[in-house]
Amino acid sequence: MVKAGKKVKGASKVRENETEEEKKIRLEMEALAADEAERKAQEAARVALRERQLREQRYAHLNGIKIHNQWRKIMRMAKVEELRREIEILSQNHEREVDRKDAIMQMLDRDLEEAEEQYSLAVRSHMLVVDNLLDLQYQRMRALEAEFAADLKALEDEFETERTEIVNAHTRQRKDMGDMIAAMEGEFADAEAELRQEYEAQREEIKNRNSEEYNVLKIQLEGIIEELEKSFELAHRAYLESTEHRTNTFRTLTKDDAKAALKIERQMRKLVRLQEALQHWRTKIATNGREWEERNRALRNEKEIMARHYAKLKSSMDAFRAGQAERLKQLSLASSGAMETLRGKLAVAENVLKLAELARKYETEQEKVLPFWNPAQAVPSGEQGDEEAAAQAEAEAAALEPSAAELGELGLRASMPEDSSKEAPGPSKSSAGPGKPKFSSYGLDPSSGSEVDEWDYLNCFFRRYNKALLDKTAIDKEKSRLERENADLRSILKQYLDGISVNDDVLNNPVNPLLVVNNRLQITLTERNKARAAAMAQRAAAATGAGLSVTGQGAGGGGQKQLVEVQVVSRVS
């Protein structure tokens, strides 16, 4: 833009006197000057902005380094706190395991001492038995050695007798065999001499007869051979004289025929090769034409298929992007709720761990060794508890277990995303089989390491809870029994004091023990006291059986609760 400046005096006169061309030149110069000034201003602004940008980049780089350092410090402190908490949890677990192992070692030491005592007793009894067996074996060996010596003596005598008889028989048989061999050798030599003489005489006779026949046949064959040679020579000369010209002609024609046949064979081979090559190329051209036509058709079909697949894939990708965006929105909305739920569960878990650590101080030695109590193992065979206490404890445990299971299931469902809840709408699907989805990761059995079903996750917790509930029920029953027994004892003591003291209350009491009417009042009171004592003894025995069935093991665990039986024998004089 052209900036307006102050008007110069006399400029109007100059402008009035200037021509159109000068005016045009002046306006162009003013426009160029304005453009140059504007360009300089823009360049200065650009340089200032670039310097400001570089300065901001340096500041941002330095601030980023500071922020990263500060963030590293914060993360390091958070990580240190997290590691401290983990170390504290690990140390608590380690202490718990150490206590449990110490208790196990003490129990094993006691078992080892008992086993060593049993072993020493068994060794002593075994050595006594072995000594008795050795004595018996030595006696048996001496008897067997004597029997063996007697048998050996008898066998040696029998052997010598049989050996003498066998040697004598062998000598006699050997002498007889020598005589028989000498007689047979003499007879064989005489027969061999006679046969050899007969063989030589027959051999000489046959040799003379064969030589005479050979000479006669040789003379006859020589005459026949000479006559045949003469006749063959005459026939051969006559044949050669008659067939010499035809033989020469035949040889010449044979050579010409061989040359012509060779030439014809070469031409035929060449012609066959050309025909085969022509047929091969025709077949190859037709085959290539069909092949390339099929390839072109296949390429066109593949092009159409790829085009349709591309369109379908593009539409599916668009739909997938839209679905993923929607799922991302749902995930971002559900993540905050899940994080809040997890924080609440983490607080509950920390509270549970704190309570467990506090409760661990009050655990007995048996509970440290066997932390998860099994009611089937705790109740010994042949003992029965109080039926009312057992029924009440089972009813309370059955009422509490479903509620706790439902709460745990609801908590697990709340921590799951909506997709997972849609896939597993009910607890029946989650526990139907191994292929069904589950609310949480697998739980493992601490003893065998096998997978635990989802419905059995809180089994160990309910074991300890039921044990504590049964202990509490037994203690309440024992407390009520002791209160009733205390009241009965107070009543008996009051009656006894009333019977031995004289005061206004006793005299004003309608049932006065000092008053005897026909000697029946004291008898009635005595029978009543005996019946009350029998009822108290029966209740005490029932409460004792219930306590033993609940606590189990009796004196085996050093920290088990001991039930106290109080027996009071009141005698009214």
Swiss-Prot record:
<dbReference type="GO" id="GO:0005858">
    <property type="term" value="C:axonemal dynein complex"/>
</dbReference>
<dbReference type="InterPro" id="IPR029440">
    <property type="entry name" value="DRC1_C"/>
</dbReference>
<comment type="similarity">
    <text>Belongs to the DRC2 family.</text>
</comment>
<dbReference type="InterPro" id="IPR039505">
    <property type="entry name" value="DRC1/2_N"/>
</dbReference>
<keyword id="KW-0488">Methylation</keyword>
<dbReference type="InterPro" id="IPR039750">
    <property type="entry name" value="DRC1/DRC2"/>
</dbReference>
<dbReference type="Pfam" id="PF14775">
    <property type="entry name" value="NYD-SP28_assoc"/>
</dbReference>
<feature type="compositionally biased region" description="Basic residues">
    <location>
        <begin position="1"/>
        <end position="12"/>
    </location>
</feature>
<feature type="modified residue" description="Asymmetric dimethylarginine">
    <location>
        <position position="142"/>
    </location>
</feature>
<feature type="coiled-coil region">
    <location>
        <begin position="15"/>
        <end position="231"/>
    </location>
</feature>
<keyword id="KW-0963">Cytoplasm</keyword>
<feature type="modified residue" description="Asymmetric dimethylarginine">
    <location>
        <position position="96"/>
    </location>
</feature>
<dbReference type="Pfam" id="PF14772">
    <property type="entry name" value="NYD-SP28"/>
</dbReference>
<keyword id="KW-0966">Cell projection</keyword>
<dbReference type="GO" id="GO:0070286">
    <property type="term" value="P:axonemal dynein complex assembly"/>
</dbReference>
<protein>
    <recommendedName>
        <fullName>Dynein regulatory complex subunit 2</fullName>
    </recommendedName>
</protein>
<keyword id="KW-0175">Coiled coil</keyword>
<comment type="function">
    <text>Component of the nexin-dynein regulatory complex (N-DRC), a key regulator of ciliary/flagellar motility which maintains the alignment and integrity of the distal axoneme and regulates microtubule sliding in motile axonemes. Plays a critical role in the assembly of N-DRC and also stabilizes the assembly of multiple inner dynein arms and radial spokes. Coassembles with DRC1 to form a central scaffold needed for assembly of the N-DRC and its attachment to the outer doublet microtubules.</text>
</comment>
<feature type="region of interest" description="Disordered">
    <location>
        <begin position="1"/>
        <end position="22"/>
    </location>
</feature>
<keyword id="KW-0969">Cilium</keyword>
<feature type="region of interest" description="Disordered">
    <location>
        <begin position="416"/>
        <end position="450"/>
    </location>
</feature>
<keyword id="KW-0282">Flagellum</keyword>
<comment type="subunit">
    <text>Component of the nexin-dynein regulatory complex (N-DRC). Interacts with DRC4 and DRC5.</text>
</comment>
<feature type="coiled-coil region">
    <location>
        <begin position="470"/>
        <end position="501"/>
    </location>
</feature>
<feature type="compositionally biased region" description="Basic and acidic residues">
    <location>
        <begin position="13"/>
        <end position="22"/>
    </location>
</feature>
<dbReference type="GO" id="GO:0005930">
    <property type="term" value="C:axoneme"/>
</dbReference>
<feature type="coiled-coil region">
    <location>
        <begin position="258"/>
        <end position="359"/>
    </location>
</feature>
<keyword id="KW-0206">Cytoskeleton</keyword>
<dbReference type="GO" id="GO:0031514">
    <property type="term" value="C:motile cilium"/>
</dbReference>
